[in-house]
């Protein structure tokens, strides 16, 4: 039977090759050499692209820097909802590059795609800024505007991601491949410069400027929006200087159809009646031209190498989550400068700005002079190893922190701290329901202690009997407690005798390097205490206890206090990182109020500087892996599919974020053990990647052109040539 003839069931085994598809590609017209920057190999158009990328990254990272706080304090979402939406937005930003690449390669081309999606990007910033104006509607409207804005921003930033880097690479002639390689380093430099500056500036716009009596989120979102407008204007200004390769048809659809046809054709002919073919994609030769099949082969070869890569991003992206939470339990006082926990991640773009020229101009050149073939894939493998080491160091730091962290009571346990506000020493005996002794402790008057005693209960809730011996007096008080809580027993004067009150304590270190304070008012007048931006704390008279209030670390020499008829000042002194304080207001003097200061939970002692080694390692890993990966993706992509491959590279970042969410949600491990788990997983992935890369044969510029005129070389497996020994890891 003729293989090109329909059978009785009207199923087509093979489709005839159209005359148009069999024709060779028309020769390209001679290219005009674009103007260069100061006689270098860099086209002038590159300057517009790099400035555009700097402004766009400033816009993105600046908005993202204050996004979580916006969710928490403006929309009043809880931490779980805020975290979920934040990571969902981040993942969406790395999934949409597939759409942008498809539009660029099959419809509009890279230039128009960048222009149009940048307009969508700007519109998203407009919605986001409007959603941060307090007087504009209620919470529902703010939420809708915010989610619409974030969706448009994700579409805009994700859609242009694969296009901008590849469009910059298009500006170079083939003979300037070395300059193109350096361009990707400059491009990555612009990304991190924008990230570094915006991460410093936008939190200042939010916190230091007040809008409608609160933090100015509208300004913090509006300024990044203006930077995106500037990015669009700068990019459009270079329009006449750009080389604009036209789109080469519906590439994504062609690739999918080609792969599908090859698989179906191979499956239909699995009986072996027809001769075997050198590669499974060769089964598409009856319908698709050889140059397309060769391009798809080159694409799948690189995509196969991409399979292990998400694990690297799973580690790298934890700088903004797990590592920040780790910094939250450390002391940010560096002596000459006080560093907040969420500011530590600024170290990454700062080090990138140093490491990129250091690696390009010094380290790589020294390795080259030693005649070591340090290829792109080898750099990426070394980057993975450095990331493994970074997380091993993070695990060591975490174990050190665990030795200093404030413990939490378990089931049928409570922690009890005794504070003596009486004039003399008091002996405290705590008895259980069966009069069994749970605690015997002597406490000096106004003794400053951070000591908590662990008491074992007989049930989840229980009444405890407190026997207080003061001079010759014995006082008995009963208090109810519940398991897994921390309590403070406050002993105070009651005329000639003493009494006690049991106050539930948080027992938890304040988040984000803040200090937590509360007050006990022994005066006979109600007291209002003003702590800067928040509403005054009200403390009732005669041993009234205030709620906790978190404040920034710093000195508070003159806190405003007032009763119904007088105004006073109160010196709180230095409030330190992660410390919980109790202030007992004892009396009024001519200088103001006097208070006794006690630390419930001690200061974070481990310096945040101990995170420096892990940041150095992970940043070096990023430079070797990410910068190299950008250039590798471009150089190994067929000319018709460069944006598609760039989008696939970014897609590995999205998958990496999902890995973090899954492991963090279901591992149930201690934090140090989770760090070790990630380190070991990446080490295994690195070994697999190294084996895959050993057999990888790099794509040469003439490979796909030659494929249209001669037989496709023998390649086996998943596009890994097992016959050649000309390997390049």
Swiss-Prot record:
The modification Phosphothreonine is found at residue 12. The modification Phosphoserine is found at residues 9, 28. One of its GO terms (biological process) is oligopeptide transport. Residues 402-611 are annotated as: Extracellular domain (ECD). It is found in: Apical cell membrane; Cytoplasmic vesicle, Phagosome membrane; Cell membrane. Residues 1-35 are annotated as: Disordered. Optimum pH is 7.5. It is a multi-pass membrane protein. It comes from the Eukaryota. Glycans are attached at residues 435, 448, 528, 587. Keywords: Cell membrane, Cytoplasmic vesicle, Glycoprotein, Immunity, Innate immunity, Membrane, Peptide transport, Phosphoprotein, Protein transport, Symport, Transmembrane, Transmembrane helix, Transport. Disulfide bonds: none annotated. InterPro entries: Alpha/beta_knot_MTases, MFS_trans_sf, Oligopep_transport, POT_fam, PTR2_symporter_CS. Strongly expressed in kidney cortex and medulla. Also detected in brain, lung and spleen. Expressed in choroid plexus. The keyword Protein transport applies. Residues 79-87, 135-139, 205-217, 317-343, 402-611, 665-674 are extracellular. One of its GO terms (cellular component) is phagocytic vesicle membrane. It catalyses: a dipeptide(out) + 2 H(+)(out) = a dipeptide(in) + 2 H(+)(in); glycyl-L-leucine(out) + 2 H(+)(out) = glycyl-L-leucine(in) + 2 H(+)(in); glycyl-L-lysine(out) + 2 H(+)(out) = glycyl-L-lysine(in) + 2 H(+)(in); glycyl-L-glutamate(out) + 3 H(+)(out) = glycyl-L-glutamate(in) + 3 H(+)(in). The keyword Repressor does not apply. Interacts (via extracellular domain region) with trypsin. The extracellular domain (ECD) region specifically binds trypsin. Belongs to the major facilitator superfamily. Proton-dependent oligopeptide transporter (POT/PTR) (TC 2.A.17) family. Proton-coupled amino-acid transporter that transports oligopeptides of 2 to 4 amino acids with a preference for dipeptides. Transports neutral and anionic dipeptides with a proton to peptide stoichiometry of 2:1 or 3:1. In kidney, involved in the absorption of circulating di- and tripeptides from the glomerular filtrate. Can also transport beta-lactam antibiotics, such as the aminocephalosporin cefadroxil, and other antiviral and anticancer drugs. Transports the dipeptide-like aminopeptidase inhibitor bestatin. Also able to transport carnosine. This is Solute carrier family 15 member 2.
């Amino acid at each position: 039977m003729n293989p090109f003839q329909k059978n009785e069931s009207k199923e087509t085994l093979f489709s005839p090759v159209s005359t148009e598809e069999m024709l060779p590609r028309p020769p390209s017209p001679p290219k005009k050499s674009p103007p260069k920057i100061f006689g270098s190999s860099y086209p002038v158009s590159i300057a517009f692209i790099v400035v555009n990328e700097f402004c766009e990254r400033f816009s993105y990272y600046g908005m993202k820097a204050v996004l979580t706080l916006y969710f928490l304090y403006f929309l009043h979402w809880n931490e779980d909802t805020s975290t979920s939406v934040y990571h969902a937005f981040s993942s969406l930003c790395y999934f949409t590059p597939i759409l942008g690449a498809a539009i660029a390669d099959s419809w509009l081309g890279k230039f128009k795609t960048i222009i149009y999606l940048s307009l969508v990007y700007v519109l998203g910033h407009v919605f986001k800024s409007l959603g941060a104006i307090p007087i504009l509607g209620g919470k529902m409207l703010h939420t809708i505007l915010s989610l619409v804005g974030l969706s448009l921003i994700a579409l805009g930033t994700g859609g242009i991601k694969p296009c901008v880097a590849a469009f910059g690479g298009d500006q170079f002639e083939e003979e300037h491949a070395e300059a193109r390689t350096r361009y990707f380093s400059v491009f990555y430099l612009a990304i991190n410069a924008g990230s570094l500056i915006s991460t410093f500036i936008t939190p200042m716009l939010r916190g230091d400027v007040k809008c409608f009596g609160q933090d100015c989120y509208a300004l913090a979102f509006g300024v990044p929006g203006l930077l995106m407008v500037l990015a669009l204007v700068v990019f459009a200004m270079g329009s006449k200087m750009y080389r604009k390769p036209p789109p080469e048809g519906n590439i994504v659809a062609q690739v999918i159809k080609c792969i599908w046809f090859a698989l179906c054709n191979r499956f239909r002919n699995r009986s072996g009646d027809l001769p075997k073919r050198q590669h499974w994609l060769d089964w598409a030769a009856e319908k698709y031209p050889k140059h397309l099949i060769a391009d798809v082969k080159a694409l799948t070869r690189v995509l196969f190498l991409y399979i292990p890569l998400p694990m690297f991003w799973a580690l790298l992206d934890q700088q903004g989550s797990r590592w920040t939470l780790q910094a939250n339990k450390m002391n940010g006082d560096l002596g000459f400068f006080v560093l907040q926990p969420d500011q530590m991640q600024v170290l990454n773009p700062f080090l990138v700005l140093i490491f990129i020229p250091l690696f390009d101009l010094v380290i790589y050149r020294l390795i080259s002079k030693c005649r070591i073939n340090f290829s792109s894939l080898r750099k990426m493998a070394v980057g993975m190893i450095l990331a493994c080491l970074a997380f091993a160091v993070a695990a060591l730091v975490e174990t050190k922190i665990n030795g200093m962290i404030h413990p939490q009571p378990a089931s049928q346990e409570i922690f009890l701290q005794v504070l003596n506000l009486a004039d003399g020493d008091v002996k405290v005996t705590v008895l259980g329901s069966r009069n069994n002794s749970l605690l015997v402790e002597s406490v000096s008057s106004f003794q400053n202690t951070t000591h908590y005693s662990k008491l074992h209960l007989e049930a989840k809730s229980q009444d405890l009997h407190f026997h207080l011996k003061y001079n010759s007096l014995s006082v008995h008080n009963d208090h109810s407690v519940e398991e897994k809580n921390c309590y403070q027993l406050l002993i105070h004067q009651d005329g000639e005798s003493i009494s006690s009150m049991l106050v539930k304590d948080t027992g938890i270190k304040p988040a984000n390097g803040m200090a937590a304070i509360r007050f006990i008012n022994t005066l006979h007048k109600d007291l209002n205490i003003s702590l800067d931006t928040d509403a005054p704390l009200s403390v009732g008279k005669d041993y009234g206890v205030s709620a906790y209030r978190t404040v920034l670390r710093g000195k508070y020499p003159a806190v405003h206090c007032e009763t119904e008829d007088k105004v006073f000042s109160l010196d709180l002194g230095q409030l330190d990182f992660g410390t919980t304080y109790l202030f007992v207001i004892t009396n009024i003097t001519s200088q103001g109020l006097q208070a006794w200061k006690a630390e419930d939970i001690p200061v974070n002692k481990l310096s945040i500087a101990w995170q420096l080694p892990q940041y150095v390692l992970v940043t070096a890993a990023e430079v070797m892996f990410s910068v190299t990966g950008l250039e590798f993706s471009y150089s190994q992509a067929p000319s018709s599919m460069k944006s598609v491959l760039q989008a696939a590279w970014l897609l590995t970042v999205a998958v990496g974020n999902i890995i973090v969410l899954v492991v963090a949600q279901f591992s149930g491990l201690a934090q140090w053990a989770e760090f070790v788990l990630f380190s070991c997983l990446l080490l295994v992935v690195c070994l697999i990647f190294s084996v895959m890369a050993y057999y990888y044969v790099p794509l040469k510029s003439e490979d796909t052109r030659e494929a249209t005129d001669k037989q496709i070389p023998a390649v086996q497996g998943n596009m890994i040539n097992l016959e050649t020994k000309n390997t390049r890891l």
